[in-house]
């Protein structure tokens, strides 16, 4: 950006990311304002394959330097909105930043990988790690996992593997969470798990959230809860939005700051990265607790302390890129808890998932 401003002192710089937390982190690291792609382009929720539409002609990007972070999360629909909105006149430069080895987009298209593989786009690989401190074992373990090197995979110091029996994983995760909250603070401590809603899986984010809320933020007599189905939301709870809307997108994480009694139910005021958004009773169904989140939901985020259960029961879901994605969310401390053999097997499981497209072949043919 500094180089661009020297060459084009009057040029415009636009910073974007797929999620609110990723945009917030981009703002902090670049010391310049960044927004979500959706907000920058003026996209609104719609019953379309992408889940969004650009009303009218939508927002247009006035060229200049456009930088999009965490681009591995972007699928073909969102990428199409972005390119359509860009003024591709001389002097316009688009930089896509992302880690192609993380989990692919949950929507169709592996755009970042296709752009790299097509041979038509200039690619720069960044090799210096800025997230973890120099000498961090988190970075070392992440590299070993990403290259499939189980022989030299060692844990110590700030990246720890605690091997416990399967029936002790849940309690060990809870114990480590409470310990980590005391050391790093609640806002900086997350459990990241492979599974989401299964009530039969005690290590799903749904089940872990119930247990962690009971310990960290239990009910208090005389204090109002907002209730949606079996979920109770209280002041201080960390929550994740699960449905796109005009003011918040799927995957945005916030904290409940107020519960307001209504004639029917209660309204929540939630702080999403500094923006207070109200969720009336009819929107509560779109919220879930976020003491524990899935690996997919953690993409684009970084946390001081991350705890991840590794269970043999998840063996078909534990892939190299899933574990690599989870480990690289941790900035200061990474705790993996569970079955060591399941961990080693995940490093050798190179199944990537995702929905393929023909973009790479079409670009290569140009």
Protein language model features and the residues they cover:
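Short, charged/polar "capping" segments at the starts of alpha-helices
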Residues: 23-24, 104, 199-201, 342-346
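Structural motif
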Residues: 65-69, 190-192, 240, 307-309
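C-terminal accessory regions
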Residues: 147, 252-366
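ASCE P-loop NTPase helicase motor core
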Residues: 1-156
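Structural beta-sheet core signal
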Residues: 15, 96, 191-193, 308, ...
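Residues at the starts of beta-strands that form the adenosine-phosphate
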Residues: 12, 93, 188, 332-333
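Conserved helicase motor core of P-loop NTPases
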Residues: 87-88, 100-246, 255-259
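Residue-level "contact hotspot" at macromolecular interaction interfaces
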Residues: 60, 232, 247-250, 296
């Amino acid at each position: 950006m500094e180089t661009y401003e020297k060459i084009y002192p009057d040029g415009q710089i636009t910073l974007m990311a797929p999620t609110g937390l990723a945009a917030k982190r981009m703002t902090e690291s670049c010391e310049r304002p960044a927004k979500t792609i959706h907000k920058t382009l003026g996209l609104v929720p719609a019953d379309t394959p992408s889940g969004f539409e650009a009303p009218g002609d939508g927002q247009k990007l006035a060229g200049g330097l456009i930088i999009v972070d965490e681009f591995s999360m972007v699928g073909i629909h969102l990428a199409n909105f972005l390119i359509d909105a860009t003024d591709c006149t001389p002097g316009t430069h688009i930089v896509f930043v992302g880690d192609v080895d993380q989990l692919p987009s949950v929507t169709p298209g592996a755009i970042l990988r296709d752009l790299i593989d097509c041979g038509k786009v200039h690619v720069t690989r960044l090799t210096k790690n800025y997230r973890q401190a120099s000498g961090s074992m988190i970075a070392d373990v992440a590299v070993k996992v990403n290259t499939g090197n189980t022989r030299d995979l060692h844990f110590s110091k700030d990246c720890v593997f605690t091997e416990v029996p399967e029936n002790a994983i849940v309690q060990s995760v809870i114990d480590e969470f409470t310990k980590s909250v005391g050391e790093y603070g609640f806002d900086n401590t997350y459990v990241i798990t492979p599974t989401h809603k299964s009530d039969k899986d005690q290590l799903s984010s749904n089940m872990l959230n119930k247990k962690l809320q009971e310990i960290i933020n239990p009910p208090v007599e005389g204090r109002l809860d907002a209730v949606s189905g079996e979920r109770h939301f209280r002041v201080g709870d960390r929550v994740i939005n699960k449905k796109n809307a005009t003011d918040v997108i799927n995957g945005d994480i916030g904290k409940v700051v107020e519960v307001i009694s209504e004639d029917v139910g209660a309204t929540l005021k939630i702080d999403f990265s500094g923006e207070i958004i109200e969720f009336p009773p009819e929107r509560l169904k779109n919220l879930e607790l976020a003491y524990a989140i899935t690996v997919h939901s953690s993409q684009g985020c970084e946390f001081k302390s991350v705890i991840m259960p590794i269970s043999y029961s998840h063996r078909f879901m534990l892939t190299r890129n899933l574990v690599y994605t989870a480990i690289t969310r941790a900035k200061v401390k990474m705790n993996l808890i569970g079955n060591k053999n399941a961990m080693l097997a995940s490093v050798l499981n190179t199944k990537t998932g995702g929905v393929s497209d023909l973009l790479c072949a079409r670009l290569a043919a140009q």
